[in-house]
């Protein structure tokens, strides 16, 4: 039997087979209202039974950036070439794992996922080998939500995580743009 992150994370989190698939994305209306109506309507295509995406990305100009909303994450860069100094890189720690937990994307397996995340936080600076292994498991779960061969397959949960992450990062950028220049956006 071959083992990879798909089988390891799936087997670790589930004991009773596949998780339940969602029939629609699970994002509160109030969160969807934080983006432009055109972006919101693009994302709501995910609730159509045929699940055929007519629009794949929408680009908006805001705070000096071309910001691309889509189904693979939020991406943004300055609209024109710029020269900058004193650059700071900010990273949202365990963003997708925390969204997976918040949305309960794994159903009953979410509690095991929480245990893995808590264990990783506990040993992050004490045991690099175990910490990196747990990080690999945590991060592979998001991809497995959209992997048809995984017991974790739940495409609308994957898209819910992705959309939620885009809204959260977009909101963070809007708030930061009052006090700094945004030069790169990437979920």
Task: Name what the model sees in each region.
Residues 1-87, 92-98, 175-187:
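Conserved "right-hand" nucleotidyltransferase catalytic core of DNA-directed polymerases
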């Amino acid at each position: 039997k071959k083992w990879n992150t798909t089988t390891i994370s799936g087997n670790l989190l589930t004991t009773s087979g596949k998780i339940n698939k969602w029939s629609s994305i699970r994002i509160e209306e109030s969160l969807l209202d934080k983006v432009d109506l055109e972006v919101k309507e693009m994302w709501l295509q995910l609730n159509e039974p045929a699940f055929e995406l007519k629009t794949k990305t929408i680009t908006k100009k805001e705070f000096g950036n071309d910001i691309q909303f889509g189904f693979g994450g939020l991406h943004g860069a300055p609209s024109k070439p710029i020269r900058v100094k004193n650059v700071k890189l900010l990273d949202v720690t365990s963003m997708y794992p925390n969204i997976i937990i918040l949305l309960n994307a794994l159903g009953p397996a979410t509690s095991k996922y929480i245990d893995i995340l808590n264990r990783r936080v506990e040993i992050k600076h004490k045991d690099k080998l175990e910490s990196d292994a747990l990080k690999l498991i945590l991060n592979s779960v998001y991809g497995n939500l959209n992997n048809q061969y995984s017991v974790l397959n739940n495409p609308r949960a994957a898209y819910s995580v992705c959309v939620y992450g885009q809204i959260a990062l977009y909101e963070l950028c809007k708030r930061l743009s009052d006090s700094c220049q945004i030069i790169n956006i990437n979920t």
